[in-house]
Amino acid sequence: MERVMECDYPASKKNKVVHPMDCEMKEEPTNAASMNQHSLWSQWQLLDSILPTGGFAHSYGLEAAMQSRMVNNPEELRSFVVQVLENTGSLLLPFVCCANKSPDAATWVKLDQLLEAMLTNEVSRKASMSQGSALLRVAASVFTEIQSLQDLRQTFLGSKIVSFHHAPIFGLICGLVGFDSETTQRAYMFVTMRDVISAATRLNLIGPLAASVLQHQVAEDAERMVQKWKDRGVEEATQTSPLLDALQGCHAYMFSRLFCT
């Protein structure tokens, strides 16, 4: 007897059965779909913590806050992370947004120069430059199919025109890789949250499991910050946490420290 199987859709009143081959429908992937899938893999890789951009060398002022006795327990740590996210959203998200919407060299240079003038302490300024230059170097080496990344690095490397600040570079690269504007801004907040909480584990404020729990809990606050500060122009960029800015500036004066900033 010939083997038969029922299709997923309801059978007719005559309980008709069909051959399995009749139920199979194959669609050949189009070139557009294939390229879109490849783009998704690139986007995920850009957010992977294994990408050697130097983010884990910076504590966003957390180490200075600990030594100043301003962050001593998980509750104070959560408050600190939220303040970092608020300040990141208000000050840096406009640069990420604008660079993503216009991922070209001319716009990026203007944004980089403006952010250079706006950063008010030397420690955070150097951290931004270090992470930005590392991110561009890695992106140009990894995403070789995007020629403009290599062109940017070769053109401006060693010049004094730009400082390679992290926020504009991040927005630019995300735009070239295929992120939309809102996803790019949310991704930047995620990377910031991830790195601050990672720094907390290495400072023994919390353990790895508690860090994962905290990241899940703070995600709601991070999304609220995204909705509050997204899609703003750089003329609206502002510092919302002057105390955090002062703490970051104190890092260079600590006698012993684990992080660069």
From Swiss-Prot:
InterPro entries from the UniProt entry: UreF, UreF_sf
Query: Is Lyase set as a keyword in this record?
Result: no
Pfam families xref list: UreF
Which UniProt keyword terms apply here? Chaperone, Nickel insertion
GO biological process assignments:
protein maturation
The superkingdom listed in its UniProt entry is Eukaryota
Instruction: Cite the GO molecular-function annotations of the record.
Output: nickel cation binding
User: Which family does the record assign?
Assistant: Belongs to the UreF family.
Function of the protein:
Required for the maturation and activation of urease via the functional incorporation of the urease nickel metallocenter.
Subunit composition?
URED, UREF and UREG may form a complex that acts as a GTP-hydrolysis-dependent molecular chaperone, activating the urease apoprotein.
Supply the PANTHER family for this chain.
UREASE ACCESSORY PROTEIN F
Q: What is this protein called?
A: Urease accessory protein F
| Species this protein is from | Oryza sativa subsp. indica (Rice)
